[in-house]
Amino acid sequence: MALRMLWAGQAKGILGGWRTICLVVSLFLQHPGVSSKCYFQAQAPCHYEGKYFTLGESWLRKDCFHCTCLHPVGVGCCDTAQHPIDFPAECEVLQEAGTCQFSLVQKADPRLPCKGGGPDLEWGSANTPAPGASAPHSS
């Protein structure tokens, strides 16, 4: 009888561990944004700016990371901001103060928005040609 109770307790512990892992994976899979950066801090406390959170509660940090309490396992966080990655060399990315929004501006004058000017075929998606242009021929 004692052995049966011990096995039941071990099985419950294993099942609880799998539930936690499934919760962590599902939270990260449900997060919007395909190119989001996510990380997990094992055994991290669930508090931010003096406020404590319980299992499943979440908060948005000032650096635009959305974090979820996975107590007692830790904290999982994903970047919610969409960062531009392919833009003309004469432009730069600026984060708007106090928001999770980004703007493309001219390096020469950050007050002016970036001028597109078409794709840069040397800096893009595997040197793919612009729509309507002929594909490069390999020799």
Curated annotation (Swiss-Prot):
Q: Where in the cell is it found?
A: Secreted
Supply the alphabetized keyword list: Chemotaxis, Cytokine, Disulfide bond, Inflammatory response, Secreted, Signal
Q: Name one Pfam family in it.
A: PSP94
Region Disordered: start and end of each range?
Answer: 116-139
BP term (GO), one: lymphocyte chemotaxis
* Broad class of where this protein is predominantly found: secreted
- Cystine bridges: which residues? C38-C78, C46-C69, C64-C100, C67-C77, C91-C114
Entry keyword Signal: yes
Any GO MF annotation of the entry: cytokine activity
Extract the signal peptide range: 1-35
Gene Ontology terms: cellular component: cytoplasm; extracellular space
On whether Disulfide bond is a keyword of this UniProt record, the answer is yes
Query: So what does this one do?
Result: Acts as a ligand for C-C chemokine receptor CCR2. Signals through binding and activation of CCR2 and induces a strong chemotactic response and mobilization of intracellular calcium ions. Exhibits a chemotactic activity for monocytes and lymphocytes but not neutrophils.
Family statement drawn from the similarity comment of this UniProt entry? Belongs to the beta-microseminoprotein family.
Q: What is this protein called?
A: Prostate-associated microseminoprotein
